[in-house]
């Protein structure tokens, strides 16, 4: 981990971008750059004032190319199309990336994997330490219950979220499926309507709720005969996501070029369940 990584925040004017700026400052690291779309009216504004923490002397830039030389790592919580361009630029420049964007196409996922051969990339659907502890608990529960229970995942988010199910819900499903030796693409059931017939034991169901200002809630249900185990994570604000992403940014600087996730950042791969 770099002692004082130079961190760039992409999508700095967005809700998550502003919180990331706060998190970088709270962690005592250097905010080297804050980037927005070239046409944004925020270009030229002070990043600290935008984030509500006062003047810090870092201006919002409209060009990632111009500021990459000042960064050891960038944090990207933007949109798939934007991240696609950022991957190409950071790969060519050899600048590490921490990516929290969700909703990628298969082609965009392939580009991410290719970029990780050029520069280190941390990619996770959720950077909350609590969520990643939850994933570890799901792996343990899956090992214990095996195929003896029905598994359902319920997720809830604010009304503005555009992808469903959430990346975190899919991450939970993938962790469960992998532990059970299943293929989530084959076993996932994303909606039920009409006469569906009896539930197939191998299926992993997903239910989505959208409304209000829910930051993020995820519950995995292991449903047996006569008992049910529920493992739940609830986020009450976004700082936990931002703090985890900043932790990942500090960790990834200087690592070899490959794709990492929060299991690597938190050392979970060394913990057996």
From Swiss-Prot:
Report whether Amino-acid biosynthesis shows up as a keyword of the record.
yes
Q: Does the keyword Oxidoreductase apply?
A: yes
The EC number of this protein is 1.17.1.8
GO molecular function list: 4-hydroxy-tetrahydrodipicolinate reductase; NAD binding; NADP binding; oxidoreductase activity, acting on CH or CH2 groups, NAD or NADP as acceptor
Indicate the residues that form the catalytic site.
Answer: 157, 161
CDD domains attached here?
A: DHDPR_N (cd02274)
Pathway assignment reads:
Amino-acid biosynthesis; L-lysine biosynthesis via DAP pathway; (S)-tetrahydrodipicolinate from L-aspartate: step 4/4
Q: Which residues bind (S)-2,3,4,5-tetrahydrodipicolinate?
A: 158, 167-168
Describe the reaction catalysed, as an equation: (S)-2,3,4,5-tetrahydrodipicolinate + NAD(+) + H2O = (2S,4S)-4-hydroxy-2,3,4,5-tetrahydrodipicolinate + NADH + H(+); (S)-2,3,4,5-tetrahydrodipicolinate + NADP(+) + H2O = (2S,4S)-4-hydroxy-2,3,4,5-tetrahydrodipicolinate + NADPH + H(+)
Binding locations of NAD(+): 11-16, 36, 100-102, 124-127
- Taxonomically, the superkingdom here is Bacteria
Cite the binding residues for NADP(+): 37
Pfam families (alphabetical): DapB_C, DapB_N
Keywords, sorted A to Z: Amino-acid biosynthesis, Cytoplasm, Diaminopimelate biosynthesis, Lysine biosynthesis, NAD, NADP, Oxidoreductase
**Cellular component, GO annotation:** cytosol
Q: Which PANTHER family match?
A: 4-HYDROXY-TETRAHYDRODIPICOLINATE REDUCTASE 1, CHLOROPLASTIC-RELATED, DIHYDRODIPICOLINATE REDUCTASE
The task this protein performs is described as: Catalyzes the conversion of 4-hydroxy-tetrahydrodipicolinate (HTPA) to tetrahydrodipicolinate.
The name on file for this protein is 4-hydroxy-tetrahydrodipicolinate reductase
Q: Please state which protein family the record places this protein in.
A: Belongs to the DapB family.
User: Main site of residence?
Assistant: cytoplasm
> What's its top-level EC category?
oxidoreductase
């Amino acid at each position: 981990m770099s002692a004082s990584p130079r961190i760039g925040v992409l999508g700095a004017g967005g809700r998550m971008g502003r919180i990331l700026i706060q998190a970088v400052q709270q962690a005592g690291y250097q905010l080297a750059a804050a980037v927005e779309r070239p046409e944004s009216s925020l270009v030229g504004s002070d990043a600290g004032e935008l984030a509500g923490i006062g003047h810090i002397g870092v201006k919002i830039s409209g060009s990632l190319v111009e500021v990459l030389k000042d960064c050891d790592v960038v944090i990207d919580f933007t949109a798939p199309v934007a991240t696609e361009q950022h991957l190409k630029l950071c790969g060519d420049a050899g600048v590490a990336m921490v990516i929290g964007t969700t909703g990628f196409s298969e082609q965009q996922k392939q580009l991410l994997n290719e970029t990780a051969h050029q520069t280190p990339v941390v990619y996770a659907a959720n950077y909350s330490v609590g969520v990643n502890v939850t994933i570890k608990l799901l792996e343990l529960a899956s090992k214990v219950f095996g195929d003896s229970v029905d598994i359902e995942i319920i997720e809830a988010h604010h009304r503005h979220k555009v992808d469903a199910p959430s990346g975190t819900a899919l991450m939970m499903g993938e962790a469960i499926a992998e532990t059970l030796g299943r293929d989530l693409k084959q076993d996932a059931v994303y909606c039920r309507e009409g006469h569906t017939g009896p539930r197939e034991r191998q299926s992993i169901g997903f239910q989505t709720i959208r409304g209000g200002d829910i930051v993020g809630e995820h519950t995995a249900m292991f449903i047996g005969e006569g008992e049910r185990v529920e493992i739940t994570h609830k986020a009450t604000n976004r700082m936990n996501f931002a703090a985890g992403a900043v932790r990942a940014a500090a960790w990834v600087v200087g690592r070899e070029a490959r794709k990492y996730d929060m299991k690597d950042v938190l050392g979970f791969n060394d913990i057996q369940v």
